[in-house]
Amino acid sequence: MILIKFGGSVITDKSRYRTFNADRVKRLCKEIRDSDEKVIVVHGAGSFGHVLAKENNLNDGFKDPSQIPAVAQVCYDMRDLNAMIVKELNDAGLPAVSVPTGSCFMMRNRELIIDDPTVLKSMIDKGIMPVMFGDVVMDTELGFAICSGDQIMERLKTIFNPSRVVFVSDIDGLYDKDPKNNKNAKLIENVDRDVLKSVETDITVADVTGGVRGKMETMLRMCSEGCDCVLVNGTVEGRLLTLLKGGKVPCTIARGE
């Protein structure tokens, strides 16, 4: 089984509120279908979640009743986005079912709690594809908090022990230098903590590298014996399919020891 996350930058236009990239999602769903692999899909929020969550400081927890309308709107927007993704998966012939994180699980001081994964395991055993997503989740300490798609990925990794974890993004992977400003920047095919430290020293443009670095940290925590974590560019047609079928594509891999 393979755990796949569609990043928000792939499935939406992050610069425009509630802008869904339907054609790209349709193609990615078909690539998953054509791989003949059993997968669990998680997706990020993109422009459906981040804008309102940031404007209303939702990740700081419950501070004031004035936040509640924003909580409701973000939850509505995320379920709307999820419904569109689930539809594309089903249209591609994949039996996908929504599992809303905020309706099914709790957090404790921003840490996702899935004490009883029986329902998720039962769905997988019956050939149903659960689709989870970043969401506003009730928090026992903070009242509520934002649960990211990456947090869900880490928790599902411990539950299902997948053979591979794939993060689908809008970039080829981690570079040794900022590729936007340096034509000699090289894609780093294999990353470990020492490599990541050297990249942090060489690259200083935080707004360009911060998201990639955070993703690499997540991948390094998740990779384990028999399970590599891969960051691949989903904006390029065929890359995800080739990767899932065992082919070589431009990407960055955190290899399990």
PLM features: residue spans?
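Polyanion-binding loop/helix "lid" in catalytic or ligand-binding cores
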Residues: R24-L28, A70-V86, G143, Q151, ...
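Glycine-rich loop at the start of a catalytic domain that most often binds anionic cofactors/ligands
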Residues: G46-F62
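Short, active-site-adjacent cap segments at secondary-structure transitions
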Residues: V10-T12, G46-V51, C104-M107, V137-D139, ...
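Catalytic-site beta-strand/loop segments enriched in glycine and acidic/polar residues
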Residues: K5, V119-E154, R193-G210
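Ligand-binding beta-strand-loop-alpha-helix segment within the catalytic cores
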Residues: N57-V137
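Acidic, metal-binding active-site segment of PIN/NYN-like and related structure-specific nucleases
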Residues: I159-N184, L231-G238
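Glycine-rich beta-strand-to-loop/alpha-helix junction loops that act as flexible
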Residues: F6-S9, V42-G46, V232-G234
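N-terminal glycine-/serine-/threonine-rich phosphate-binding loop
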Residues: M1-I40
